[in-house]
């Protein structure tokens, strides 16, 4: 998957999903689908994530969002939409044996706790779809908490860029070790 051209779908626009969608958008990547508990939005050409985040921050839900070229989809529709990368960042058991055969993503990054059932995981594996497990995908917060602890006990101060570089190094090393399994 070429990150620069990857179509990304994010289920859940809370702290994890919303932030992930915003980071992808700011990095110039195409976020084609997002959702909240009321349903989702899909646009093959990419969504305006800052506008959607502003809309949500004003107390609105995605079922009320309107923009030319944007289609409303169900949460299951988001899970099975045309995309390269799928990030379930909402609830557990969103990818099941009922929808795993219809998933079009080549890579799934589990940002929610337990979003994929065991049966679905077997189906995805048999189809060659890579799943980055939640225990790895969620580890970034724990790693940064460790960095905060180290800074406090050693009276250090690291800027955000330094923290992000250290986090990226640790997470990439962990991912590569898991992927090699």
Task: Give the role of each language-model region.
Residues 73-83, 91-108:
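Rossmann-fold NAD(P) dinucleotide-binding segment
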Residues 62-63, 84-88:
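Short acidic/polar alpha-helix capping motifs at helix-coil junctions
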Residues 16-20, 94-95, 116-118, 139-141:
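Short glycine/serine/threonine-rich phosphate/pyrophosphate-binding segments
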Residues 1-80:
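Glycine-rich phosphate/diphosphate-binding loop of Rossmann-like nucleotide-binding domains
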Residues 7, 29-33, 84-85, 106-108, ...:
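Structural motif
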Residues 36-39, 91, 113, 135-137:
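Short, ordered loop/turn segments at secondary-structure junctions
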Residues 101-181:
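Adenosine-phosphate binding glycine-rich loop
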Residues 70, 87-93, 111-116:
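A general structural motif
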């Amino acid at each position: 998957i070429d990150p620069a051209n990857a179509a990304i779908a994010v289920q859940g626009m809370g702290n994890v999903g919303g932030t992930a969608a915003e980071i992808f958008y700011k990095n110039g990547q195409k976020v084609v689908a997002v959702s909240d508990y009321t349903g989702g939005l899909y646009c093959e050409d990419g969504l305006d994530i800052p506008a959607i985040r502003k809309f949500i921050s004003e107390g609105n839900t995605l079922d009320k969002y309107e923009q030319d070229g944007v289609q409303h989809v169900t949460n299951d529709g988001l899970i099975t939409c045309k995309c390269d990368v799928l990030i379930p960042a909402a609830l557990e058991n969103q990818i099941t044996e009922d929808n795993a055969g219809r998933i079009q993503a080549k890579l799934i990054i589990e940002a929610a706790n337990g979003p994929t059932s065991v049966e679905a995981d077997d189906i995805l594996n048999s189809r060659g779809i890579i799943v980055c497990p939640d225990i790895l995908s969620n580890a970034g917060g724990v790693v940064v908490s460790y960095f905060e602890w180290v800074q406090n006990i050693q009276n250090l101060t690291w800027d955000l860029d330094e923290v992000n570089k250290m986090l990226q190094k640790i997470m990439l090393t962990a991912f590569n070790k898991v992927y090699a399994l």
